[in-house]
């Protein structure tokens, strides 16, 4: 899948789930399950409940996403 096919939305981490997954509520009210991107894991960027993040999603499955940036 090409990078252009992804959708990016800002959101807030609501809950930490097992296996490095997170429940994220987007700014438009939609809620989804997200995992951290590999570069964030590699650089040991911590994500906690209440953090504002940017979530990347595919148009084929809007219930799952990937956290690719944590806002400061």
Swiss-Prot record:
* Cellular component terms per the entry's GO annotation: cytosol
Q: What is its main location?
A: cytoplasm
| Keywords in alphabetical order | Cytoplasm, Initiation factor, Protein biosynthesis, RNA-binding, rRNA-binding
Mention one GO molecular function.
ribosome binding
Name the source's superkingdom.
Bacteria
Q: Could you confirm whether the keyword RNA-binding appears in this record?
A: yes
For this protein, the record's PROSITE patterns field holds:
S1_IF1_TYPE
Domain S1-like, chain residue ranges per copy: 1-72
- Asked if the keyword RNA-binding belongs to this entry, the reply reads yes
Q: Please state where this protein is localized.
A: Cytoplasm
According to the record's subunit comment, the protein's assembly and interactions are: Component of the 30S ribosomal translation pre-initiation complex which assembles on the 30S ribosome in the order IF-2 and IF-3, IF-1 and N-formylmethionyl-tRNA(fMet); mRNA recruitment can occur at any time during PIC assembly.
- Tell me, in a sentence or two, what this protein's role is: One of the essential components for the initiation of protein synthesis. Stabilizes the binding of IF-2 and IF-3 on the 30S subunit to which N-formylmethionyl-tRNA(fMet) subsequently binds. Helps modulate mRNA selection, yielding the 30S pre-initiation complex (PIC). Upon addition of the 50S ribosomal subunit IF-1, IF-2 and IF-3 are released leaving the mature 70S translation initiation complex.
The family note in this entry says: Belongs to the IF-1 family.
Q: Would you tell me the protein name for this molecule?
A: Translation initiation factor IF-1
- Which species? Cereibacter sphaeroides (strain ATCC 17023 / DSM 158 / JCM 6121 / CCUG 31486 / LMG 2827 / NBRC 12203 / NCIMB 8253 / ATH 2.4.1.) (Rhodobacter sphaeroides)
